[in-house]
Amino acid sequence: MAKKALINRNLKRQALAKKYAAKRAAIKAVINDSNATEEERFEARLRFQSIPRNAAPVRQRRRCALTGRPRGTFRKFGLGRIKIREIAMRGEIPGVVKASW
């Protein structure tokens, strides 16, 4: 089980990313616009720097919903590999069966 602080920190980052997503996209559009003047692009860069660092989606970590484990997490289920195996063995995930060939 991951520390509660790490799980909460990740949730906070997700909330910040959602809150600032539109603002980040608008500012990045100005920064990447080749038709904008250098002054406009510079001002946009300054505004971009004022956005919190944790608002960047890159800083989020995909974690297991049950344990908070940061590695070995399947996107399809949102669970870590260990929990997927435990739940699948109990037959609680529809359509998932143990492989045999």
Swiss-Prot record:
GO terms for cellular component: cytoplasm; small ribosomal subunit. Disulfide bonds: none annotated. GO terms for biological process: translation. The keyword Ribosomal protein applies. Transmembrane segments: none annotated. One of its GO terms (molecular function) is structural constituent of ribosome. Keywords: Ribonucleoprotein, Ribosomal protein, RNA-binding, rRNA-binding. It comes from the Bacteria. Binds 16S rRNA, required for the assembly of 30S particles and may also be responsible for determining the conformation of the 16S rRNA at the A site. Belongs to the universal ribosomal protein uS14 family. Part of the 30S ribosomal subunit. Contacts proteins S3 and S10. This is Small ribosomal subunit protein uS14. It comes from Neisseria meningitidis serogroup C / serotype 2a (strain ATCC 700532 / DSM 15464 / FAM18).
